[in-house]
């Protein structure tokens, strides 16, 4: 719900939220502020101009969907002051989280590249298609010899700004992204290997949402290297409940998973909905 609620928060609001997290035992929050600054530096080193970078990086209100590979450039361009401001803000956020023993989850490298990366950089990419009419970023094929190079550059720039994390979120092919021509097993392994090269003890955090994560992409990954967030578990669980409209016969296989509840989708108020279902699904999952 980052872009529903938190897109324009300043340090005063984030400080309050992090204190609230600590008081309520939340120890694994998404920390994606300032990822646009990482991408700015990465693309600069790959030869993109400021204008080209801003054609790729989404505006403040749309960065959640950008980082889930759904769109690019929408809501931009961002002024230079925005990047500087968000980098400084993320440094304060991460510092406070770590002081409290909270593990930030940084956006990792999922294979995303600008839609024009084939023409600009000569990369072997696939086209994931459109998302609700928006052009998606391209997906860098795991067989491209520069996959490891670009992933390493991404993590290097992330580390420079915010240090290494032990958890990274990556959600390629989110909400119907086309996987035509993509070896999903190889893609999962390439994404995992790039993360592990950066930090051997890091864990990939993926959202279970609609068809993601694709079973073929995670089926041959080692147990313990991936945590799946069953994001809508109170309503459409994927852990293996046959009654669910998002039923997965084998759940998440060998991988650890977390029962999550979306409830209000961020910032909405009101007590309504399938209240009995909310309670029952949790205990059904525990069984």
Regions found by a protein language model. Name each.
Residues 1-16, 28:
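N-terminal hydrophobic targeting/anchoring segments and the immediately downstream early-domain regions
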Residues 4-5, 22, 27-69, 75-287:
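Catalytic-core regions of glycoside hydrolase
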């Amino acid at each position: 719900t980052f872009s529903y609620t938190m897109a324009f928060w300043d340090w005063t609001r984030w400080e309050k939220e992090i204190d609230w997290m600590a008081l309520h035992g939340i120890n694994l929050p998404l920390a994606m502020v300032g990822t646009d600054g990482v991408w700015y530096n990465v693309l600069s080193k790959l030869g993109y101009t400021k204008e080209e970078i801003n054609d790729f990086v989404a505006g403040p209100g749309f960065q959640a969907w950008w980082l889930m590979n759904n769109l690019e450039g929408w809501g931009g361009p961002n002024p230079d002051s925005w990047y500087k401001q968000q980098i400084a803000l993320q440094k304060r956020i991460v510092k406070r989280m770590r002081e409290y023993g909270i593990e930030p989850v940084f956006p990792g490298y999922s294979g995303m590249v600008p839609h024009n990366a084939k023409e600009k950089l000569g990369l072997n990419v696939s086209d994931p298609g459109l998302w609700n009419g928006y052009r998606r970023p391209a997906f860098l094929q795991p067989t491209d010899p520069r996959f490891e190079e670009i992933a390493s550059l991404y993590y290097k720039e992330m580390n420079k700004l915010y240090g290494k994390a032990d958890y990274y979120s990556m959600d390629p092919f989110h909400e119907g992204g086309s996987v035509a021509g993509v070896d999903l097993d190889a893609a999962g392994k390439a994404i995992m290997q790039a993360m592990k090269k950066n930090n051997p003890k890091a864990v990939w955090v993926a959202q279970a949402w609609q068809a993601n994560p694709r079973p073929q992409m995670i089926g041959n990954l080692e147990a313990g290297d991936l945590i799946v967030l069953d994001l809508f578990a109170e309503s459409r669980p994927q852990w293996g409940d046959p009654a669910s409209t998002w039923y997965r016969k084998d759940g998440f296989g060998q991988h650890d998973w977390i029962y999550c509840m979306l409830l209000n989708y961020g910032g909405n108020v009101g007590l309504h909905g399938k209240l009995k279902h909310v309670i029952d699904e949790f205990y059904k999952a525990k069984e």
